[in-house]
A protein has these predicted regions:
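Mature extracytoplasmic enzyme cores
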Residues: 21-386
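Bacterial Sec-dependent N-terminal signal peptides
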Residues: 1-21
Length: 386
């Protein structure tokens, strides 16, 4: 089915360093094939991102909204006690503050893309208020949107499990390996009977919800021409192929998270030792709103030089991981989308914003490549450290 988006008045969002350009929906074309996959065409990458947001929202707006709820402290209001844990974790891991602190590390081109995507989300929410999960969720700003991505990657990297262990006063246990998992392979042309280079992808994702792949084709006059999969709320392809190259992600199991028990000052219960000196824990009270409970529930969140810090019966524990230190993972995927050869692709992944995942790569020039990618610390190998 072929149609052109009707003109819709978008929200103009304020962004200090980079003034936004208002997207004109009439310049965007969404063509759905016989499978319902959207093929989105426009002059600029930002316009394509607007169209992608609109197409995703048409298909599953609820899943798109879910990762954004903690940004507005609304997950508890929508999902009850379980959701309130997400609101607490968002505050605990300081996703909003980290986004603000690292904002200038994002490329201007990506910021324009994100602006277009957010304008598309806000426009759809305004046009379809009956589909909005909570009346206070929209409009959402670009910085709020990026902070939601930081939170999602922080949780996906295992911070949620560390949080649960500390909350339950339980020790870390070696997990049993699951024999089921995603698969990917790249085969050089010299090893195939047809003389062609092959890239195989068999990603194991659920069929529904925010972790399900959403397939799309994005095409602009600024060099974006890629098809593949993304997760709910993604502004670009996270796993796919363009005219010149392709890549696959599978989950790897690198040790990306450290948990520290802090040595507290006997003379001051909110001071901890770091490099031989005592430092004050940063303390903040968050007000959690829970569906069905008329009053706010107050909880303390702490921050140390190690990172997000919690208190349990055994003392204070901090959670430290690379995913909670950077904000440019979507920017990196955007640069991967636009890469024309291995040199450009490697330059994109060399930014080291992606905190996990295997990367399997192949291109039309018969280059194949694999890396088990992660943001991991250089740890002290002595038993005392562990």
């Amino acid at each position: 089915m072929r149609r052109i988006l009707a003109a819709i008045v978008g929200f103009i969002l304020y962004l200090p360093a980079f003034p936004q350009q208002r997207i004109q929906p009439k310049n965007i074309e969404i063509v759905r094939d016989s499978f319902g996959v959207p093929h989105i065409f426009a002059d600029t990458d930002a316009e394509v991102a607007y169209g992608l947001a609109w197409a995703q929202a048409e298909d599953d707006f609820a899943s798109m909204q879910e990762p954004m709820l903690p940004v507005k402290n609304l997950m508890g209001r929508v999902q009850g006690k379980k959701g309130a844990a997400g609101d607490y974790a968002f505050a605990l891991f300081r996703c909003r503050e980290i986004t603000e602190e690292k904002w200038n590390t994002l490329s201007p081109g990506f910021i324009k893309l994100a602006e277009g995507y957010v304008q598309g989300i806000n426009a759809y929410a305004r046009k379809h208020p009956e589909e909005v999960l909570h009346e206070k969720l929209f409009p959402i700003s670009v910085k709020e949107y990026i902070s939601s991505a930081v939170f999602a990657l922080t949780i996906f990297n295992g911070a949620d499990q560390a949080l649960i262990r500390i909350f339950n006063n339980s020790e870390w246990e070696v997990p049993e390996l699951n024999n089921k998992g995603s698969n990917a392979a790249a085969v050089n042309a010299g090893q195939t009977s047809s003389g062609e280079t092959f890239l195989f992808i068999n990603a194991h994702q659920p069929n529904t919800g925010s972790q399900a792949f959403y397939e799309a084709h994005l095409c602009s006059k600024e060099g974006l021409n890629i098809t593949g999969g993304l997760l709910a709320g993604g502004p670009c392809i996270l796993h796919g192929v363009n005219e010149n190259l392709g890549w696959a992600h599978t989950v790897n199991y690198c040790d990306r998270v450290d948990e520290y028990q802090l040595e507290m000052n006997p003379a001051n219960s909110l001071q901890y030792k770091f490099d031989g000196q005592w430092y004050n824990l940063e303390e903040k009270t968050v007000r959690l709103r829970v569906k069905g409970i008329p009053i706010a529930v107050k909880r303390k969140v702490y921050w140390s030089r190690y990172g997000a810090t919690m208190k349990n019966k055994q003392g204070f524990f901090a959670i430290r991981l690379g995913a909670n230190m950077k904000i440019g993972v979507l920017d990196q995927w955007y640069q991967m989308d636009k890469a024309r050869n291995f040199s450009e692709f490697y330059a994109a992944i060399d930014k080291q914003e992606l905190s996990m995942f295997n990367i399997m790569y192949a291109d039309r020039y018969d280059t194949i490549f694999y890396i088990s990618n992660a943001l991991m610390p250089v740890r002290d190998a002595s038993p005392v450290y562990n």
